[in-house]
UniProtKB/Swiss-Prot annotation:
ABC transmembrane type-1 domain boundaries: 281-505
Protein name: Maltose/maltodextrin transport system permease protein MalF
Main location: membrane
Keywords: Cell inner membrane, Cell membrane, Membrane, Sugar transport, Transmembrane, Transmembrane helix, Transport
GO cellular component: maltose transport complex
Domain of life, source organism: Bacteria
Entry's Gene Ontology BP terms: maltodextrin transmembrane transport
Similarity comment: Belongs to the binding-protein-dependent transport system permease family. MalFG subfamily.
The protein's assembly and partners: The complex is composed of two ATP-binding proteins (MalK), two transmembrane proteins (MalG and MalF) and a solute-binding protein (MalE).
Regions crossing the membrane: 17-36, 40-57, 70-92, 284-306, 319-341, 370-392, 413-435, 484-506
Length: 514
């Protein structure tokens, strides 16, 4: 006898396909909206991920993929997609001065205007809940008055000549300032059909478009007569000389263009970028290597000590030594920043009392780097200590008993037995720690902000800057503008360098993953 399983209403196929259909419509709407807004990469990414997700969760044959899809989607969205965007930006001139599309930059220039013709003093006079606009010609003394109107939106006011201004009290400067946005949307039309708009808090004046666009793309300044053409190599409207060559003047804002590998070329050819880049790269490698070596050394030694059988109160020592790992790193970094203060820090007070010295932790390059390594070692050793404590449990006690019979001491046991047996399983974690510290942005940003600064560079760079913080400063702290394209190029190089170093380290260790 066949048993018929009763389905609940939420298990029905109609409900499932209805939900899938609604999700599909919502995704389609979002994709179209992104496409209309010009966000093509986001539209493509959303379409791919959502289509794959709907197919996998709607098809019974792809049931196993339902467990894999969230991880793959997360990796694609948060790893691959930003990587592709960064590499794409690296081949453009995208910056704080070249953010717009060509059409948008052209429209911004065409919207600019300049004062032309007469200037009129204006006043606002209340008429109940409405206002009247009055203009006065300073040269002839003639007055012009509008009908009553209310603020709101763009509007044209037809003004008529009048012998005298209204008798009410004229609006003061505070009221005009409060309604400035509304007044900027008013166009006053005089009896001779000339138009004037608000040019200051007390004046209306005639305006003309600053630029005129020809059919061939030539832009002419109506005030100075200078002509401009779009230069697709630099991403600006640039002046042209009488012989047709490019002039020196560029119109801002610029627009984004593809410039090929120029950003990468700048890194290796521009001395103002090249010198700090290679110096910062060397320091980044040294910092990462020293951090890994010191954290492993300190963590391993402390792990051996707290595992020592003769030591009393081991649990208390373990808790105390792991505490730096429990405190959020940004809090510890800011505390150390205060402790290392050159004038009032406790560390300098102690060194001055004991040895009569006050190191310049934040102004001298060498001591600043030493401080960074000290703080990072403090932050990183608890992690390595926890790992070593676990790995020490896997070492057989028979090895130490045999070495004791041969007369070996603690140091011989450590270097002949403990270290060789711990270093191999630690190697992948050491490589991961190296990669993490290679991009340890939080430490540098909060502790030194990259300082002390280097002199004679065209980009902001400091002696404690890592490549990642150097990239950040180029992108967001550049005095000559935020150069996102150059920062993206350096970020791409960092990705390649970290990947190459990780591969070299793995091959150098000749590890076998069985």
């Amino acid at each position: 006898m066949d048993v018929i399983k009763k389905k609940h209403w939420w298990q029905s196929d109609q409900l499932k396909w209805s939900v899938i259909g609604l999700l599909g419509l919502l995704v389609g709407y979002l994709v179209v909206l992104m496409y209309v807004q010009g966000e093509y990469l986001f539209a493509i990414m959303t379409l791919i991920l959502s289509s794959a997700g709907l197919y996998i969760f709607a098809n019974r044959k792809t049931y196993a993929w339902r467990y894999v899809y969230p991880g793959l989607a997360g990796m694609g969205l948060f790893v691959l997609f930003p990587l592709v965007c960064t590499i794409a930006i690296a081949f453009t001139n995208y910056s704080s001065t070249n953010q717009l599309t060509f059409e948008r930059a052209q429209q911004v220039l065409m919207d600019r205007s300049y004062q032309a013709g007469k200037t009129y003093n204006f006043g606002l006079y209340p008429t109940g809940d409405e206002w009247q606009l009055a203009l006065t010609d300073g040269e002839t003394g003639k007055h012009y008055l509008s009908d009553a109107f209310s603020f709101g939106g763009e509007q044209k006011l037809q003004l008529k000549e009048t012998d005298a201004l209204p008798g009410g009290e004229r609006a003061n400067l505070r009221i005009i300032t409060q309604n400035r946005l509304a007044l900027n949307q008013i166009t006053a039309v005089l009896p001779d059909e000339s138009k004037v708009i608000m040019s200051s808090l007390r004046q209306f004046s005639g305006t003309r478009p600053l630029y005129t666009l020809a059919d061939d793309g030539l832009l002419t300044n109506n005030q100075s007569g200078v002509k401009y053409r779009p230069n697709n190599d630099s991403g600006y409207y640039q002046s042209i000389n009488a012989d047709g060559s490019w002039g020196d003047e560029k119109l801002s804002p610029g627009y984004t263009v593809t410039i090929g590998a120029k950003n990468f070329t700048r890194v290796f050819t521009d001395e103002g970028i090249q010198k700090p880049f290679f110096a910062i790269f060397v320091w980044t490698v040294v910092f990462s290597v020293l951090t890994v070596v010191l954290t492993v050394a300190v963590g391993m030694v402390l792990a051996c000590l707290v595992q020592w059988e003769a030591l009393k109160g081991k649990a208390i020592y373990r808790v105390l030594l792991i505490l730096p790992y429990a405190v959020p790193s940004f809090i510890s970094i800011l505390i150390f920043k205060g402790l290392f203060n050159q004038s009032f820090g406790e560390i300098n007070m102690m060194l001055s009392a004991l040895f009569g010295i006050k190191p310049a932790w934040f102004s001298d390059p060498n001591t600043a780097r030493a401080m960074v390594i000290i703080v990072n070692t403090w932050l990183g050793y608890p992690y390595m200590m926890i790992l070593c404590m676990g790995l020490l449990k896997a070492i057989p006690d028979d090895l130490y008993e045999a070495s004791a019979m041969d007369g070996a001491g603690p140091f011989q046991n450590f270097f002949k037995i403990t270290l060789p047996l711990l270093i191999k399983p630690l190697t992948p974690l050491m490589i991961a720690s190296f990669a993490f510290n290679f991009n340890n942005f939080v430490l540098i940003q909060l502790l030194t902000n990259g300082g002390p600064d280097r002199l004679g560079t065209t980009t902001p760079a400091g002696y404690t800057d890592l490549l990642v913080s150097y990239t950040y400063r180029i992108a967001f702290e550049g005095g000559g503008g935020q150069d996102f394209g150059l920062a993206a190029a350096i970020a791409t190089l960092i990705f390649l360098l970290v990947g190459a170093l990780a591969i070299v380290n793995l091959k150098a260790t000749r590890m076998k993953f069985d």
